[in-house]
UniProtKB/Swiss-Prot annotation:
Biological process per Gene Ontology, one example term: translation
Name of the protein this chain belongs to: Small ribosomal subunit protein bS18
Pfam family, one: Ribosomal_S18
Entry-linked HAMAP family: Ribosomal_bS18
Role of this protein: Binds as a heterodimer with protein bS6 to the central domain of the 16S rRNA, where it helps stabilize the platform of the 30S subunit.
GO MF annotation: an example: structural constituent of ribosome
């Protein structure tokens, strides 16, 4: 049986040389939140532990300040 080629995950923030993840950068934060509002884990995104912690803090701040919704499934 042939195994499928799986793309190597890498930390986007480390590759771009980002020092601090900003809670006001909503375009970036939306890529790391699911439709149901959950923060996507680093094993799926490939984000390093340092930046995953910063990402979680930034998302929580943006939610608290009503910049990001807690969930997109409101009806």
């Amino acid at each position: 049986m042939a195994r499928y080629f799986r793309r190597r995950k890498f930390c986007r923030f480390k590759a771009e040389g980002v020092q601090q993840i900003d809670y006001k950068d909503l375009a970036t934060l939306r890529n790391y939140v699911t439709e149901s509002g959950k923060i996507v884990p680093s094993r799926i995104t490939g984000t390093s532990a340092k930046y995953q912690r910063q990402l979680a803090t930034a998302i929580k701040r943006a939610r608290y300040l009503a910049l990001l919704p807690y969930t997109d499934l409101h009806k």
